[in-house]
Amino acid sequence: MFNTLLVALDGGPQHDRVLDLAATMAGPRSRLHLLCVLDPEFALAAGATDADRREYPAAARQQAHAEAVLADALAELRERGVDAIAQLPCGDPGEVISAQARRLQCDLIVIGHRHLSRLQRLFEPSVGQWTIDHAPCPVLVETRDP
């Protein structure tokens, strides 16, 4: 079992499987750090007002989606008796995941797999591959289809 796990979530199709895998890897005294990384191009500043949300609807939608993903994940894990906290940072997902894992001294990172083709990877780099290459700890990738 692992004590400090970082679980990267994006609300994608593998969301439930990633959460289940992370909960399975957690021990009775483990803490899961749930992470949903916002694109900085569309992130609202801390303390954003309703006027800001109306002015930047794409940012408001992204933030609301990420907050909902984390709230649902926290509720599910707490229902299972797993200690978890959530974070909503901005930045490049791979870089943020690796930096947070280093800062938190994580024993394990749990992520999903988007099953990109080689062509898709040319235009949309793999967060998972970047994380594997730069992580300070083992990375467990959920590869099963949802």
Regions found by a protein language model. Give the residues of each.
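A conditional alpha-helix N-cap/helix-loop micro-motif detector
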Residues: H15, A66-E67, C90, R121
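A short acidic, glycine-rich active-site loop
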Residues: R53-A68
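Structural beta-alpha unit
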Residues: A75-I109, P146
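Phosphate- and divalent-cation-binding pockets in alpha/beta enzyme and binding domains
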Residues: R17, V96, R118
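Conserved beta-strand positions in the Rossmann-like core of class I SAM-dependent methyltransferases
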Residues: H33, I85, L140
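Gly/Ser-rich helix-loop-strand patches that form or flank binding pockets
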Residues: T24, A99-P146
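Small/aliphatic-rich secondary-structure junction motif
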Residues: M1-R53
